[in-house]
């Protein structure tokens, strides 16, 4: 497996059939097994450190180009910017932006299927009912935690990323600071919440420390409305 830069927003990953075998991926999976390929894609993104390679201003998308010895995966940073060059905070505007983004991906998938004679391709990204069983199990509210090495990283992050949370708490544990946020997936949509979380993590790091663990073993510095309190500092 190797990759090369195409331009500042695009790279090409070359995977041989032996590489695909190592990941237990078949060529047919690229055209009929969306969940497996999405998981494979994110494994490559993590393994190659591609999130750090790009400018973190959009979503990473990919396109598959088979060749005799394997496949080329063209990875592109797809801009997700609204008017003024920022991701919209309004849930309806964000949903509209994502609808256009998914439509574009579905068009690319349909073109690829047509070129390869695949007649049963069913565009499903972003459509109502996609992964219905998973959607039905999604909680209305979700807690997530972000770890920071120092207080300045916390203050910089929360002042640069503006959003309305349901509740937030602030802890210290083992020399690090932890911000625990409760957000409303039902009202904002899962993708909007994930986008906010990703922007917050530009100033900190994802952590597996649960709220329950921090409540029991951490030092609670701000028990309620932590974001509001910290923004006033």
UniProtKB/Swiss-Prot annotation:
One of its GO terms (molecular function) is protein-macromolecule adaptor activity. It comes from the Bacteria. The N-terminal domain probably binds unfolded/aggregated proteins; the C-terminal domain interacts with ClpC. Enables the recognition and targeting of unfolded and aggregated proteins to the ClpC protease or to other proteins involved in proteolysis. Homodimer. PANTHER family: ADAPTER PROTEIN MECA, ADAPTER PROTEIN MECA 1. Belongs to the MecA family. This is Adapter protein MecA. It comes from Lactococcus lactis subsp. lactis (strain IL1403). The gene is mecA.
């Amino acid at each position: 497996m190797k990759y090369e830069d195409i331009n500042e927003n695009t790279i090409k990953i070359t995977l041989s059939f032996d590489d695909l075998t190592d990941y237990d991926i078949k060529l047919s999976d690229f055209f009929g097994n969306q969940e497996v390929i999405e998981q494979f894609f994110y494994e490559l993104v993590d393994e190659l450190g591609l999130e750090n390679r790009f400018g973190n201003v959009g979503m990473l998308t990919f396109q598959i180009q088979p060749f005799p010895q394997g496949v080329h995966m063209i990875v592109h940073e797809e801009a997700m910017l609204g008017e003024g060059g920022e991701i919209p905070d309004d849930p309806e505007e964000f949903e509209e932006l994502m609808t256009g983004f998914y439509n574009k991906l579905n068009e690319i998938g349909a073109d690829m299927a047509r070129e390869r004679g695949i007649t049963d391709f069913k565009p499903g990204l972003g459509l109502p009912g996609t992964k219905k069983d998973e959607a039905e199990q999604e909680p209305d509210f979700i807690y997530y935690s972000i770890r920071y090495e120092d207080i300045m990283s916390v203050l910089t992050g929360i002042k640069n990323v503006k959003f309305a949370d349901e509740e937030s708490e602030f802890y210290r544990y083992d020399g690090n600071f932890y911000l625990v946020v409760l957000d409303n997936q039902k009202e904002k949509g899962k993708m909007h919440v994930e986008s906010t979380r990703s922007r917050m993590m530009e100033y900190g790091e994802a952590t597996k420390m649960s709220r329950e663990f921090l409540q029991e073993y951490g030092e609670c510095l701000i028990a309620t409305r932590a974001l509001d309190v910290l923004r006033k500092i």
